[in-house]
């Protein structure tokens, strides 16, 4: 088990839901143009639903039996059985593979340390290590190199004498790597590539890899960094024109005379347009880069390639062990399959945790945190699909009072979920007690109280037919997505030891640091982009897309573009290191950012969590099940 921590939570959110002011009033308001406020009744709209009603009898000790017509989302049962998960096996275990990996690691380390500090090759090597998913092995070495480069170029003002000063590719690559590692490199470095009119030089379009690097670097922009905004617009236009040329056979022939990497370039550009590097999870990027790009590169290094493939497979074997441990827990708690109206998505829940923290040493975090994803999914479906308002109020009250004796006051179908939730959180609290001699049950519980109260408020919107504004929706939605529960648990895992300063800092931040709120908001908006149509068909409350359409009389396409804009703007907030992050561990901050990245990955092409489509199956297979082929 790794580091733990503590913090106190905000007051109850039932009567005073987390208002914009507890986050950053301007963060939400500046993006919304809601209509003049009108009463809930006048905003009521009829709800269309393709959900099928279920007629059933619910036994509740506090009331007579009654027949209730319920909704059903008709979720498919899980395709990954317990027996299949337990049968997963890989050869990449044992000391022989570990010895081989360590030998390759030493060779790569020597390669990294003997390079000239100002060489472009050193920057490219660091970038390659990151894209292959193996840079975590050389964290200290990379940090030392980048710190020296930053001090030499920006503290000692030697940037102009740097041999790569007028090289767009080298400048953009260095900028991205330094910003990624927390160095506030000034955006003005790109003024060297502008003409007398203050526009990026058109001749830069001839350096297509430099333009692609500029595009990737622009996603490290913070608010009001206009040069980086201009860089993104310029690079996007250049890259699109390049792609158009490739589609023209005559133009393509001309390009081939000067560049043999056109196919590779096209793959990289399309990949960047789907999601920029900064927004991607490490594990998925590593598998893609290994499978599709690196082996075909003219400068491919066989030692790096062998090391990356072996490391991927060894870590994957650890993930399989973690998954099997989780699967046994799920079987033993006997909740899976009991609630036929809810999503049973154990494998998908574990995929989230691979996105949050993939390194082999963090098994405890993955094994416990994935339980929360499973429980959030089940309880979300209780509130969204099945429960009556009266039952949901009972469940919310039971979570708030946190007394297992209250189980007899709940309907039968709620008893098992509440009991499993109660036991799971208490067990996690026990782990913290053993590790740090601190009782944190109240803090873990409070995150669930906040979540359930948000769920309840959304249920009230549904039953009253209320149409929230986008502002109202996001005030609630950043919490109701459930990511805050995950990140609170992560905070306890990655802050060790817990100090009084940690507690004081969190209290001053209204108990949810900005980086948590930012990550949760991106998760909510990404979820809405991927699932809102399906959820509306199931009869759920309007999501951010529909709220924006209602507020602004906009089309769905216009609303989707605005939600993407909100995601981009929220990333700018996350790119800026707040003062409140000073008390947060580096691992925890990275998990928060990885939450946003994983959400964008999961919902990139639809509902990758609830829907068991071919794409989600393929992703699970490549990341968790199928090792990379390594010829003997």
Curated annotation (Swiss-Prot):
Q: Which residues of the sequence carry a binding annotation for (2E)-geranyl diphosphate?
A: 343, 380, 384, 524, 527
Entry's InterPro entries?
A: Isoprenoid_synthase_dom_sf (IPR008949), Terpene_cyclase-like_1_C (IPR034741), Terpene_cyclase_plant_C1 (IPR044814), Terpene_synth_N (IPR001906), Terpene_synth_N_sf (IPR036965), Terpene_synthase-like (IPR050148), Terpene_synthase_metal-bd (IPR005630), Terpenoid_cyclase/PrenylTrfase (IPR008930)
* Expressed in which tissues: Expressed in glandular trichomes two to four weeks after flowering onset.
Q: Does the keyword GTP-binding apply?
A: no
Q: What are the GO cellular component annotations?
A: chloroplast
Please give the pathway this protein is involved in.
Answer: Secondary metabolite biosynthesis; terpenoid biosynthesis
State the compartments where it is located. Plastid, Chloroplast
Chain positions recorded as Mg(2+) 1 binding sites: 380, 384
Protein name per its UniProtKB record? Myrcene synthase TPS3FN, chloroplastic
Q: Taxonomic lineage of this organism?
A: Eukaryota, Viridiplantae, Streptophyta, Embryophyta, Tracheophyta
């Amino acid at each position: 088990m790794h580091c733990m921590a503590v913090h106190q939570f905000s007051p109850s959110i039932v009567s005073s839901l987390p208002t914009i002011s507890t986050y950053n009033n301007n963060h939400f308001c500046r993006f919304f143009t809601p209509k003049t406020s009108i009463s809930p009744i006048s905003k009521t709209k009829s709800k269309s639903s393709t959900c099928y009603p279920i007629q059933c009898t619910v036994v509740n000790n506090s009331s007579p039996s009654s027949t209730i017509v319920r909704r059903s989302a008709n979720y498919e049962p899980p395709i990954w059985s317990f027996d299949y998960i337990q049968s997963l096996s890989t050869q990449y275990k044992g000391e022989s593979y570990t010895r081989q990996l360590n030998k390759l690691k030493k060779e790569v380390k020597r390669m990294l340390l003997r390079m000239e500090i100002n060489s472009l090759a050193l920057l490219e090597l660091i970038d390659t290590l990151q894209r292959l998913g193996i840079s975590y092995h050389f964290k200290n070495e990379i940090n030392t190199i980048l710190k020296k480069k930053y001090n030499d170029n920006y503290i000692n003002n030697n940037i102009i004498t740097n041999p790569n000063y007028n090289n767009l590719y080298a400048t953009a690559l260095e900028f991205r790597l330094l910003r990624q590692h927390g160095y506030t490199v000034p955006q003005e470095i790109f003024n060297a590539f502008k003409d007398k009119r203050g526009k990026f030089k058109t001749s830069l379009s001839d350096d297509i890899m430099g333009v692609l690097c500029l595009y990737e670097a622009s996603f490290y922009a913070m608010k009001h960094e206009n040069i980086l905004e201009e860089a993104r617009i310029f690079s996007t236009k250049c890259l699109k024109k390049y792609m158009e040329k490739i589609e023209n056979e005559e133009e393509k022939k001309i390009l081939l005379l000067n560049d043999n990497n056109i196919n590779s370039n096209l793959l990289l550009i399309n990949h960047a347009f789907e999601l920029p590097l900064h927004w991607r999870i490490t594990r998925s990027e590593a598998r893609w880069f290994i499978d599709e790009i690196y082996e075909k590169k003219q400068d491919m290094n066989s030692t790096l390639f062998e090391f990356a493939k072996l490391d991927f497979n060894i870590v994957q074997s650890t993930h399989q062990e973690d998954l099997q441990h989780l699967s046994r827990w799920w079987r033993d708690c006997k909740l899976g399959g009991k609630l036929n109206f809810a999503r049973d998505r154990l494998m998908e829940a574990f995929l989230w945790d691979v996105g949050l923290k993939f390194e082999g040493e963090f098994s405890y975090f993955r094994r416990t945190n994935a339980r929360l994803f499973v429980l959030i999914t089940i309880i979300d479906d209780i509130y969204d699909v099945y429960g009556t308002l009266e039952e949901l109020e009972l469940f919310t009250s039971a979570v708030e009072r946190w007394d297992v004796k209250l189980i007899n006051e709940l309907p039968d179908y709620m008893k098992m979920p509440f009991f499993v939730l109660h036991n799971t959180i208490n067990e996690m609290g026990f782990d913290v007690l053993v590790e740090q001699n601190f009782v944190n049950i109240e803090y873990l519980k409070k995150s669930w109280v906040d979540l359930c109260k948000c769920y309840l408020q959304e249920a009230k919107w549904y039953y009253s037919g209320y149409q929230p504004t986008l502002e109202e929706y996001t005030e609630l939605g950043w919490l109701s997505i459930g990511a805050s529960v995950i990140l609170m648990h992560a905070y306890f895992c990655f802050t060790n030891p817990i100090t009084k300063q940690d507690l004081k800092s969190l209290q001053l931040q209204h108990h949810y640091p900005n980086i948590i709120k930012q990550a949760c908001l991106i998760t909510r908006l990404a979820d809405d982009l991927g699932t809102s149509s399906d959820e509306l068909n199931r009869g759920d409350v309007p999501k951010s897309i529909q709220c924006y359409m209602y507020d602004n009389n906009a089309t769905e396409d216009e609303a989707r573009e605005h939600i993407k804009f909100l995601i981009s703007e929220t990333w700018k907030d996350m790119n800026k290191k707040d003062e409140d992050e000073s008390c947060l561990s580096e691992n925890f901050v990275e998990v928060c950012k990885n939450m946003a990245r994983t959400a964008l990955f999961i919902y990139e092409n639809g509902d990758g969590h609830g829907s068991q489509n071919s794409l989600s199956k393929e992703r699970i297979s490549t990341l968790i099940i199928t090792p990379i082929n390594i010829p003997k």
